[in-house]
């Protein structure tokens, strides 16, 4: 697949270099999975570190609209700015206040399998490019203003990234497509989603993803739940490649055991309101997010 042109750089707008201390949390990271703008707002307000934003979560998620993404960036930025304002004039010296909110956008053109044809691959690449362009356009609205004029070196309010996944017919990573998606992200963090759990050989797939520049791997250890796949997750963590994010029926009550049994430093979970049907919007339960945040903050980081 040949592409013309180059991707706009997110690095200079959402990731400052060298990476300062606030980029490395001293606690287990909690990432929520949400379907709407309010879910992003709730996650940021309740203290989650990141949110993955996708549409149609009952179908395992698809790419949200560009309008939804823009509004979600603003919603997250507003919550971060409120937190920083509450921390006072020297918020930049306080890690919890300074930390940007991570927003990860799901790139998936349809439900069903993770094997994509050339047209679907082009659509995914175009989505990443368009979202990257949007991030550039919005950068001035989501980055703190420098005092006295000039370019600011303060951390941005929102750390934007992408969640992707593509396989071949034989159950291996579609290296060509994933490489193009990572290249188009051009420095923004890229997560490989739970298509990973459908790979025929997770160890081989994990090595492939490291070579492709993927920073995070979302996985249940190729099991129905993260708890059931704990041994596989632990093995991946021990191998020291991309950051492993444990996912799959993760609940607040099981977070301590999951972290202790796997050594993961990052977890991913949905926090839906009770009683929702598949035909209803998958709203986020703020109380559940807060409970999960309190739990992970109390869990000692694995050695």
Where on the chain are the PLM-derived regions?
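C-terminal alpha-helical cap/extension of soluble enzyme domains
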Residues: 2, 10, 108-112, 150-153, ...
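N-terminal amphipathic alpha-helix/helix-capping segment at the start of soluble metabolic enzymes
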Residues: 2-33, 88, 92-96
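Hydrophobic faces of well-ordered beta-strands that scaffold small-molecule active sites
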Residues: 28-32, 51-53, 101-107, 162-164, ...
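Catalytic cores of alpha/beta
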Residues: 35-45, 113-133, 200-212, 236-240, ...
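Active-site-adjacent beta->alpha loops and helix N-cap segments on the catalytic face
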Residues: 37-38, 57-79, 119, 168-184, ...
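A structural motif
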Residues: 48, 135-136, 156-159, 187, ...
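Alpha-helix-loop-beta-strand connector modules within alpha/beta enzyme cores
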Residues: 63-111, 175-192, 231-252, 286-301
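Glycine/small-residue-rich loop that forms an oxyanion/phosphate-binding "nest" at active or ligand-binding sites
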Residues: 65-83, 91-175
